Amino acid sequence: MRLPHLLLAMATFVPSFLRGTEEAYPRTPMGSIETKTLPAARLMVAESPKGYFESGNGLFMKLFRYIDGNQIPMTSPVEARLQPGVMVFYMDAGSAKRTDLQATPQVKLAETPARLVASIGVRGSYSRENFDEALAKLKAWLATRPDLAPQGEPYAVYWNSPFVPGIFKHSEVHLPVAAKPAAPAK
């Protein structure tokens, strides 16, 4: 087997714990819908005036150069807000405690509190079509939940590297939600 093929196979099939990627929170299983509380975290954020799915937005490379230059381990997932384009990397636990990390013109640092989201697990390529299809299913599910109310804009969550073939990719669509107060008893 040639080296490029071996590397592709390793990136595709080696479990994440063997690749050393720390996961910021548990995945939503593919095909499932759930609510989950995401933990408070320290984030690295890159922005573009272009939409996330527009080519040439440069978001990944801005963040990659930042983590590479600051010796921050890659974590998963990567979150993407669509319009304007925003990509978010989570810091691993050790890097989140570092005091030497500073924002740059390309990458902002942010703290986010714990938050409740409705989440759907998705298999397939990271495309606008797959995002829209999953979001429609998530909104339909949320319409059956009178105990939950949307609290923000939906966003994409990507678990795999760009080198993983689309059929093997795992993503999620999240919609921030809040519990509605129970109706008073009559």
Region spans (language model):
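A solvent-exposed interaction/effector surface
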Residues: 2-186
